A protein has these predicted regions:
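Surface-exposed ligand/attachment interfaces on beta-rich extracellular proteins
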Residues: 15-36, 49-53, 74-82, 100-104
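Short, solvent-exposed loop/turn segments that connect beta-strands within catalytic domains
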Residues: 38, 51, 64-66
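Short, intrinsically disordered N-terminal pre-domain segments
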Residues: 1-14, 107-113
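Surface-exposed loop/edge segments in extracytoplasmic proteins
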Residues: 13-17, 64-72
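Conserved Ser/Thr-centered positions that define the repeating blades of beta-propeller domains
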Residues: 59-61
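Noncatalytic modules at the cell exterior or secretory-pathway interfaces
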Residues: 39-45, 86-105
């Protein structure tokens, strides 16, 4: 399965809808820029009601199959806005490892390049 491409200046939703359980978001292919040897992405998550517990990872991959953790966030009640160098990896995604929410709550995530 091919991943959608992420171009310099793009900001995309990491999840197709508000997330209420742990799970992997959409993976995106990072487009290459001539002369660029490392790639920097930004990522964030937001919420309608603050989760009481959360662990969310930014993961990157060379091949789009084998993903590795590059950043993690686990501070409930605050909104994450992070910037991470993912080296020469070609793909990125967000992965919600664990999440505890109140009734009717959900979180969203974004990735920028």
């Amino acid at each position: 399965m091919s991943q959608p491409s992420l171009y310099r200046g793009d900001l995309v939703s990491a999840f197709p809808a508000a997330v209420t359980t742990a799970g992997v978001g959409t993976s995106y292919a990072l487009t290459s820029i001539p002369g660029q040897f490392t790639k920097k992405v930004t990522w964030s998550y937001s919420f309608t009601t603050a989760p009481s517990a959360i662990v969310i990872n930014l993961e990157a991959s060379l091949d789009g199959v084998n993903f590795f953790q590059y950043d993690t966030y686990n501070t409930p009640g605050t909104i994450a806005n992070r910037s991470v160098d993912v080296g020469q990896n070609n793909f990125v995604r967000l992965n919600v490892i664990s999440l505890t929410l109140g009734s009717g709550a959900g979180i969203g995530g974004n990735i920028g390049y």
